[in-house]
């Protein structure tokens, strides 16, 4: 085999481009989710806080827009940017494991507010209603946001932002693969055959170029910034604003690797996303148990009873677990499956994840008890 330095350098630069862009969007997605959660936590709120409902809604809408832009070949020259926005930013902005934790806490009456105020459900059967309330609201809002985003991208952005028709194209071999769960090559090919491929207006091309270059350039400065802030500030920001973004980088790449490795094994069941969501839910149950579980049955002191340790666990919950799992890709994959396969995929994912929370967090809560964390 003849070594070609030109090809090798091209692949290396492509991988560096993917790494930097994906890292930037993972950091921004995690930080955005933290900000939206903090912004939506107020009294009296129509949507009970804290919740990731707003984050899931926003990420699914953006995912829908990007799907339409890519289907009409707007992103053909910016496939790395497309990967960063969909799998990176939208994946980090939304959270499957946090949704499952909300579902478990509300259905078992174990939210922080219920424990602090000694609030009880009329009877335990109302836990079923709470379970369905969280499940249906999250899924319906997320699916509705995805569909709205796709129509917004198709009927508004593509329809009014295209300058002309362009020639069909063949994606390069080093572009983003469809195994990540966020690329629909079948829809793209269908639009090409129907001569629906369009060229974005110069403004959008320039905008994509600027965002792509910024994401490429900001990766290492952002990493250095958050490392310095995390080391310097020892207050609540470590568990809420700085550490979660650093943990989110590793979680985002793990989720992408799982999707690349396992989604192609079964087209009717995206195994990679399933493994990422289930594993993240298992971890969030364990971390929540450590943070909120009573150290002794007779006291309200949690297992993690130092402030710094509590901040680290909080960062693992919101940063690593929140970014490792995703609703935007989960909903987008279900949208592209047949209705029966979608039901199977959603039911198995949610059912197994909820059972893992019952086994880990539930068993400890019902034997030793939960309390509010110290941070």
Swiss-Prot record:
Disrupted gene: phenotype observed: Highly sensible to fluoride, but not to other halide salts. The growth of a double deletion of both FEX1 and FEX2 is inhibited at almost a 1000-fold lower fluoride concentration than in the wild-type. Has increased intracellular fluoride concentrations.
Transmembrane parts of this sequence: 12-32, 35-55, 80-100, 128-148, 214-234, 242-262, 269-289, 311-331, 339-359
Coarse class of the protein's main subcellular location: membrane
Signal sequence range: none
Highest taxon, organism lineage: Eukaryota
Residues carrying a glycan: 109, 117, 235
Keywords for this protein: Cell membrane, Glycoprotein, Membrane, Transmembrane, Transmembrane helix
Bilayer topology: Multi-pass membrane protein
Compartments, as annotated in UniProt: Cell membrane
Cytoplasmic side stretches: 1-11, 56-79, 149-213, 263-268, 332-338
GO BP annotation list: fluoride transmembrane transport
Similarity comment: family membership: Belongs to the fluoride channel Fluc/FEX (TC 1.A.43) family.
Additional remark text: Present with 220 molecules/cell in the plasma membrane.
Function: Fluoride channel required for the rapid expulsion of cytoplasmic fluoride.
Stated name of the protein: Fluoride export protein 2
Species assigned in the record: Saccharomyces cerevisiae (strain ATCC 204508 / S288c)
Lineage: Eukaryota, Fungi, Dikarya, Ascomycota, Saccharomycotina
